[in-house]
From Swiss-Prot:
The gene is cadA. Couples the hydrolysis of ATP with the export of cadmium. The active site is at D398. CDD domains: HMA, P-type_ATPase_Cd-like. It comes from Listeria monocytogenes serovar 1/2a (strain ATCC BAA-679 / EGD-e). This is Probable cadmium-transporting ATPase. Residues 6-69 form the HMA domain. The lineage of its organism: Bacteria, Bacillati, Bacillota, Bacilli, Bacillales.
C-alpha cells in the first residue's frame, strides 16, 4: 500500500457543530502528506488518507481545542465530564445580563445608558462565537444561518431593539447547547457498545486453559464459557448444551437453547450450562463489532438537513440590501429626488427587511413543540427530527419490547388430570423449575407467586436435567416430568386432542411445555412474550393519520411473528432478521417511501435506528444505546405517545409555514409602500416588531397541543 493511499481512523473529542466539523475536515485535507480526509460527525471520527501525525491533526483542530486519538488506542471509558456551567458559561452569563437589563428597563427605561449597556454585554457574551463566524461569512459573501443571525441582531440593535437582539442571541446559543448535548450523548452510547463483550476469554490451547485478550484470540481457538458468563467471541458450539440470552444482539425475548453446531455471538450471556465454543471470527469481525461499525456509518451518512430559512437567507438578505441601496441612490440621481427623503426610505426598508421575524418563525415553533412533547413524555433530540416526523410515509416497529412487553409470562395453563387440581400441578411444576435454571422458569415462578401457590414446601428428590428435553424429579415417590414434546412422545400418540392443543399453542408463537408422569400428561403450560395492550390501538390510529405502511421487524421465528403481527394489525411482517438485515430493510423502505421511522428498544436495533429518517426508542425498556442512538424517545414505555408526536409534528410544520408566509408577506407589503414613498420608519418598526410578535405567539400555540 502506498503512503498516499494509507488510511488511518482517529477518534475526535470536542466536535460540537457540523460547521466546526466541516472546517476541521478542510484543515486536515490541507496538511502536508494528506491526500484526503473525511469526518464522521455523528461518531466523532475522522478518516485520514496519507501520512501525518496526531499533533498535526490536533493543530488543524486547534480552533475548537479538538483532541485526537488513534482509534486502535482509543479507550472505551467515557471522557471526564465537564459541568453544564463550565461548558455553557457564556449562555448562563448572557441570560443573567438579560434579566438585569429587563429590571433596569422597568426602572430606568429602555433608552437608559445602564439598560443599553446591560443588553450590549448580554449580546456580546452570548453571541461572541456567532459574530466571529457571521462576520467571517459576510466578508466572504457567504450568507449562512450565522450571517443571517448576525444581520438580524445588528439590525435589531441599530433600531434600538436591544431586547429583541438579545433574545435572538439566547435562542441561537441554546440551540447550539442542545446540539452539542445530543452529539455527546450519541457518542457515549456508541462507546458503550464496546463494553458489551468481554475483553478477554478463557481459551484452551495445547490442553492448557488460560485467559487471553480478545485481540490475541485466533480463529479455531477453543473458548470455554461457564454458566453466568458473557461470550467474548463469535463461534460454534462443539461441546455442551445451554440457554443463551442473546436479546442484546438479536432482540429475541426468550433465551435460546444452544447445542453442538449452533452459532453463538459475542456479547450474549450463557445462562445455564458449560459450553466449549470454536472461535470462527476475529474480534473486529464479530457481530457486535459489525453493529458498532453500522451505527457509526449510519450516523455519518445522515447529513444535517439545511433549514429553509438558511437556504433562503443566501438570496433574501443580499436582495434586501441591494434593494435598499437602490432606493437610496436611484431616485435622487435619476429622478431629482430629495436625498434625505430617500435615505430615510432606504433606512426604513432595511429596518423592515431585518430578518428577525423570519429568523424566529421556525425556532419559536420548534422550541414550543419540543417543550410540549417533553411535558407529554416524548423526548425529541432536535427540530429537524420533529419536522421529519410530520412527513413520515412508513413506520417500522421492532417486535420485542416495542409491540410486545419484552418479558415472558404464562399465557395458558390447561390441566388434564382428574386427581390433581391446578394448584397442586402448578406447585410441583414451579418446584421443578426453581431447580432447573430453565430460561422460562421466571415466568412460571411469577405466576405461582401471583396465584399464591405454595411451591416452596414441595420436596424434590432425585432431580435431574434431561439434555434437550426437560427435567424430572420425584415428589412423594412419584416421578414427574416437565419439558418439550420429546419427553412425552408415546403419551401424545395416545391423545390426539392434547397433541393438537400443544401444536396449536406452538403455532401461536408460544413456548408450550408438557407436565406429567411417565404414563400420563397432567397439564400443558404455555409461555410467551405478551403483546402490549396499546399496540393494536396505536397501529389503528397511525393508519387513520394516513401512515398506511406499518411494518413489524423481529429476530424471532416466523410463526411467532405472523401470529403477533396479524393480531396487532400491521401492514407487513419481516421475521428472523439479524441486525444487518434490519438495516438493509430500512434502507429499502427509504428508497420506496422516502421518509421512514424505526422504533426499537435493543442494541440490535441501533443500526436501523441510526439509518432511518427518524429513529424512535422506547424509553424505560430500551437499552441506553437505543435511546441515545435514536432521535426521539417515548418515555414511560408508552407506545400511545407515537400518534401524539406525529400529530404535533404535523401541526408544527403547518405553523412554521404560516409564520414564514406571514413574515415574508409583511415585508412584501412594506416594500410596496416604498414605491409611493409612504414607508416610514414608524411603519417599518411596527411591521417588523408586529410580525415578530405575531409569529412568536403563533408558535407558542404549539404548547397547547394535547394528546
Amino acid at each position: 500500500m502506498s503512503k498516499a493511499s494509507k488510511q488511518t481512523t482517529y477518534r475526535v473529542d470536542g466536535m460540537s457543530c457540523t460547521n466546526c466539523a466541516g472546517k476541521f475536515e478542510k484543515n486536515v485535507k490541507n496538511l502536508e502528506g494528506v491526500t484526503d480526509a473525511k469526518v464522521n460527525f455523528g461518531a466523532g471520527k475522522i478518516s485520514v488518507y496519507g501520512e501525518t501525525s496526531i499533533s498535526q491533526i490536533e493543530k488543524a483542530g486547534a480552533f475548537e481545542n479538538l483532541r485526537v486519538t488513534d482509534e486502535k488506542d482509543y479507550s472505551s471509558k467515557p471522557a471526564k465530564k465537564e459541568s453544564f456551567l463550565k461548558k455553557n458559561w457564556h449562555l448562563v452569563v448572557s441570560i443573567i445580563f438579560i434579566i438585569l437589563a429587563f429590571i433596569s428597563q422597568n426602572i430606568s427605561g429602555e433608552d437608559s445608558t445602564t439598560t443599553i449597556i446591560l443588553y450590549v454585554i448580554a449580546i456580546v457574551v452570548g453571541g461572541f462565537n456567532l459574530f466571529k463566524e457571521g462576520f467571517a461569512n459576510l466578508i466572504k459573501l457567504d450568507f449562512t444561518m450565522e450571517s443571517l443571525m448576525t444581520i438580524a441582531i445588528i439590525g435589531a440593535s441599530i433600531i434600538g431593539e436591544w431586547a429583541e437582539g438579545s433574545i435572538v442571541v439566547i435562542l441561537f446559543a441554546f440551540s447550539e447547547v442542545l446540539e452539542r448535548y445530543s452529539m455527546d450523548k450519541a457518542r457515549q452510547s456508541i462507546r458503550s457498545l464496546m463494553d458489551i463483550a468481554p475483553k478477554e476469554a478463557l481459551i484452551r490451547r495445547d490442553d492448557v486453559e488460560q485467559m487471553i485478550a480478545v485481540s490475541d484470540i485466533q480463529i479455531g481457538d477453543i473458548m470455554i464459557i461457564k454458566p453466568g458468563q458473557k461470550i467474548a467471541m463469535d463461534g460454534v458450539v462443539i461441546k455442551g448444551y445451554s440457554a443463551i440470552n442473546q436479546s442484546a444482539i438479536t432482540g429475541e425475548s426468550i433465551p435460546v437453547e444452544k447445542k453442538v453446531d449452533d452459532e453463538v455471538f459475542a456479547g450474549t450471556l450463557n445462562e445455564e450450562g458449560l459450553l466449549e465454543v470454536k472461535v470462527t471470527k476475529h474480534v473486529e469481525d464479530t457481530t457486535i463489532s459489525k453493529i458498532i461499525h453500522l451505527v457509526e456509518e449510519a450516523q455519518g451518512e445522515r447529513a444535517p438537513a439545511q433549514a429553509f430559512v438558511d437556504k433562503f437567507a443566501k438570496y433574501y438578505t443580499p436582495t434586501i440590501m441591494l434593494i435598499a441601496l437602490l432606493v437610496v441612490v436611484v431616485p435622487p440621481l435619476f429622478f431629482g429626488g430629495d436625498w434625505d427623503t430617500w435615505v430615510y426610505q432606504g433606512l426604513s426598508l432595511l429596518v423592515v427587511g431585518c430578518p428577525c421575524s423570519l429568523v424566529i418563525s421556525t425556532p419559536v415553533s420548534i422550541v414550543s413543540a419540543i417543550g410540549n412533547s417533553a411535558k407529554n413524555g416524548v423526548l425529541v433530540k432536535g427540530g429537524i427530527y420533529l419536522e421529519e416526523i410530520g412527513g413520515l410515509q412508513a413506520i417500522a416497529f421492532d417486535k420485542t419490547g416495542t409491540l410486545t412487553k419484552g418479558k415472558p409470562v404464562v399465557t395458558d395453563f390447561i390441566p388434564y388430570s382428574e386427581h390433581m387440581d391446578e394448584q397442586n400441578s402448578l406447585s410441583i411444576i414451579t418446584a421443578l423449575e426453581t431447580m432447573s435454571q430453565h430460561p422460562l422458569a421466571s415466568a412460571i415462578i411469577s405466576k405461582a407467586m401471583i396465584d399464591n401457590v405454595d411451591y416452596k414446601s414441595i420436596e424434590i428428590d432425585n432431580f435431574s436435567s434431561i439434555t434437550g428435553k426437560g427435567v424430572k424429579g420425584e415428589v412423594n415417590g412419584i416421578t414427574y416430568y416437565i419439558g418439550s414434546s420429546k419427553l412425552f412422545e408415546s403419551s401424545l400418540e395416545k391423545s390426539q386432542s392434547i397433541s393438537q392443543t400443544y401444536q396449536s399453542l406452538q403455532k401461536q408463537g408460544k413456548t408450550a411445555m408438557l407436565f406429567g408422569t411417565e404414563s400420563n400428561i397432567l397439564a400443558i403450560i404455555a409461555v410467551a412474550d405478551e403483546v402490549r395492550e396499546s399496540s393494536k390501538e396505536v397501529i389503528a390510529q397511525l393508519h387513520k393519520l394516513g401512515i398506511a405502511h406499518t411494518i413489524m421487524l423481529t429476530g424471532d421465528n416466523n410463526d411467532t411473528a405472523q401470529f403477533i403481527g396479524k393480531e396487532i394489525g400491521v401492514s407487513d411482517i419481516k421475521a428472523e432478521l439479524m441486525p444487518e438485515d434490519k438495516l438493509t430493510y430500512i434502507k429499502e423502505l427509504k428508497q420506496t417511501y422516502g421518509k421512514v421511522a424505526m422504533i426499537g428498544d435493543g442494541v440490535n436495533d441501533a443500526p436501523a435506528l441510526a439509518a432511518s429518517t427518524v429513529g424512535i426508542a422506547m424509553g424505560g425498556a430500551g437499552t441506553d444505546t437505543a435511546l441515545e442512538t435514536a432521535d426521539v424517545a417515548l418515555m414511560g414505555d408508552d407506545l400511545k405517545k407515537l400518534p401524539f408526536i406525529v400529530n404535533l409534528s404535523r401541526k408544527t410544520l403547518k405553523i412554521i409555514k404560516q409564520n414564514i408566509t406571514f413574515s415574508l408577506g409583511i415585508k412584501l407589503l412594506a416594500l410596496l409602500l416604498v414605491l409611493p414613498g409612504w414607508l416610514t420608519l414608524w411603519i417599518a418598526i411596527v411591521a417588523d416588531m408586529g410580525a415578530t410578535l405575531l409569529v412568536t405567539l403563533n408558535g407558542l400555540r404549539l404548547m397547547k397541543v394535547k394528546k
